Design a protein with these regions (language model features):
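Membrane-interface "cap" regions at the ends of multi-pass membrane proteins
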Residues: 1-28, 57-62, 66-79, 83-90, ...
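Loop-to-transmembrane helix boundary motifs in multi-pass membrane proteins
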Residues: 6, 11-13, 20, 144-145, ...
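Transmembrane helix-boundary motif of multi-pass solute transporters/channels
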Residues: 12-47, 236, 247-250, 254-257, ...
């Protein structure tokens, strides 16, 4: 089976873990929510939610993962001194597998659009761009091949191990992602009328803040950091005893939020320069933004071409940093529990997630009715993980660490065995015992329309 491996540097820890949090949601969800819900007012509320929920949630998974130095399922059972607790970690692993299956479909769309941008395939009037996406997404072959191809690309990184695969890739992908983002932000903000978009994103409008906005900010803080997927727990199992958990968690939150805000500066200035009101989700990046870039840089077609290519390259990088972490969660559990090689474990994970991806891809129009409860299979997978599995795993994690695990173990991990200040430990313990579980419960009820 071989050794588990570990991250070789502090930078590797930060970039790899931040990469797991940074994904397509930073581009297609956060900017739209901020712009629609009070701009800077929403961002401020979001930061408060990060403190109330995000940081305690990350720290909880970090502590469980590092203490056990094993896969997520074994981490919970070892710390809880009972195999039944391993179910919590197993739920996280299953969640990550399902998410990787449907996430790879959208990531595959990004690959197709990167290729199409390079050859000029998505250049045309708004109706053409819309039809292009609908036709492609409903095709039975191409999107499915791209999805499986993306999982294989992810596999190629994960199979090389923690230090030679995940860490090395993160040290390349994350800086490159940031550079591409900054280049597009500069180009977007230089357009005529771009400042209207900047104002839309950053002008604080507290009149828009209501109960719903507060709950949306809580939800964004929860989902943006990959809580409840066993990702943070798995990555923390590769941390050294010298890793300052609170400092690392804070740095990761800053990177994740910074990239989300920069994504807003990439989207809104360009959109407002041509009088387009951006939406969210896949339609934003596959229909709205191709039209926006064509119109905004219409007088500079070469620049428009470059920006389009860079944008989809950016999306591919953002998706890949996320899929690497999702793949590693299942791979680690499979090869450790079955006592096989990492390569064999990675292949089992790849094949399993590819099967899920095929069903998700075909449900987008190629096979009408492929799904349940009036929803397509991809949406079913999304709802099942986001509305049920992730909140369930997270709330149990907080209660498990806050009430069941011996306080001394939690304190020792929090303070790196007394080498780091423990002044905030009582605050952390209060958060995971009371505040974070209540916040997660509110998110759960809000998703089902109860509140």
């Amino acid at each position: 089976m071989g050794s588990r491996g570990n991250f070789g540097s502090k930078l590797g820890v930060i970039l790899a873990t931040a990469g797991s949090a940074v994904g397509l949601g930073n581009v297609w969800r956060f900017p739209y929510m901020a712009g629609q819900n009070g701009g800077a007012a929403f961002i401020l509320i979001y930061l408060v939610c990060i403190i109330l929920l995000g940081l305690p949630g990350m720290m909880s998974e970090f502590i469980i993962g590092r203490h056990s130095a094993s896969n997520a399922a074994r981490a919970y059972s070892n710390l809880g001194k009972n195999k039944a607790w391993g179910t919590v970690g197993l739920v996280g692993v299953i969640t990550s597998m399902i998410i990787l299956g449907f996430y790879a479909v959208v990531a595959g769309w990004c690959l197709q659009y990167l290729y199409a941008s390079i050859i000029g395939g998505v250049h045309g009037d708004p109706e053409y761009v819309k039809t292009y996406f609908q036709t492609f997404a409903s095709d039975p072959i191409r999107p499915t091949l791209w999805a499986v191809g993306f999982i294989l690309l992810t596999h190629a990184v994960v199979v090389r191990g923690v230090r030679n695969g995940i860490e090395k890739a993160s040290k390349i992908l994350m800086p490159l992602l940031f550079v591409l983002l900054v280049v597009i932000v500069i180009a977007s903000c230089s357009l005529p009328g771009a400042m209207k978009g900047v104002q839309f994103l950053f002008h604080p409008d507290f009149s828009k803040v209501d109960e719903n906005v507060l709950l949306e900010a809580l939800g964004q803080a929860f989902f943006s950091l990959s809580l409840g997927t066993a990702c943070l727990c798995t990555y923390a199992s590769y941390f050294s005893r010298q890793t300052n958990l609170l400092k690392s968690a804070s740095q990761i939150v800053v990177i994740d939020t910074l990239i989300a805000v920069l994504a807003g500066l990439m989207i809104f200035p360009a959109a407002f320069s041509v009088g387009v009101q951006p939406d969210s989700g896949p339609s934003l990046i596959f229909i709205t933004l191709p039209n926006v870039f064509q119109q905004a840089f219409g007088d500079m077609p070469v620049v428009g071409y470059i920006i389009s290519v860079l944008f989809y390259a950016l999306l591919v990088l953002a998706a890949l940093t996320s899929t690497i972490s999702m793949h590693e969660i299942g791979t680690a559990m499979i090869y450790e529990e079955r006592k096989i090689t990492r390569a064999k474990g990675a292949w089992i994970e790849t094949i399993t997630c590819s099967i899920i991806a095929v069903f998700c891809s075909l449900s987008q129009g190629a096979v009408p009715g492929l799904g349940f409860f009036g929803k397509d299979f991809l949406t079913n997978c999304d709802n099942f993980t986001a509305q049920l599995l992730m909140p369930l795993a997270s709330i149990v994690t907080c209660l498990f660490l806050g009430w069941y695990v011996p306080k001394k173990i939690v304190r020792d991990e929090f303070t790196n065995w007394g080498t780091v200040s423990g002044k905030l430990f009582p605050v952390f313990l209060f958060m995971i015992r009371f505040v974070s579980p209540i916040c997660i419960l509110l998110i759960f009820l809000h998703q089902f329309g109860v509140i």
